[in-house]
Amino acid sequence: MSRPIGAHFHVAHGLSNAMLLPKVTEFSIEGNQERYATCARAMKWAKEKDSHEVACSKLVENLYLLNDDLKVPSPKSLGHSADKDMFRLMASQALASGSPQNNPRVPTKNQIIHLYEEVWG
């Protein structure tokens, strides 16, 4: 999903990854809750005794806080506007890249469109 943001809006790949990370992580958790809970514990954002669900919630919360602390902008705050047609095109391009298939929860085109809409704000 990062590549289309960079290609259409000239956003650096790492920055587009940062823009997407909290929302895509939140979406992906149901695909492997244990793995994401392990990440939260490794980052010291969750305790060993926390349930996977609680640890995952803390992970997502802290990813949003980290983005706030680092002042990671949204595409919209950078002045980039996109409409449903652009989101559809970007979703098709993201799927064509093959990258979404590496996600623990493989998104559909409509789910990718929705994620872009949410990231845009």
Question: What are the roles of these predicted feature ranges?
Answer:
Residues 1-65:
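Active-site segments that bind and position negatively charged phosphate/pyrophosphate groups
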Residues 36, 40-42, 46-121:
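C-terminal charged capping/lid subdomain of soluble metabolic enzymes
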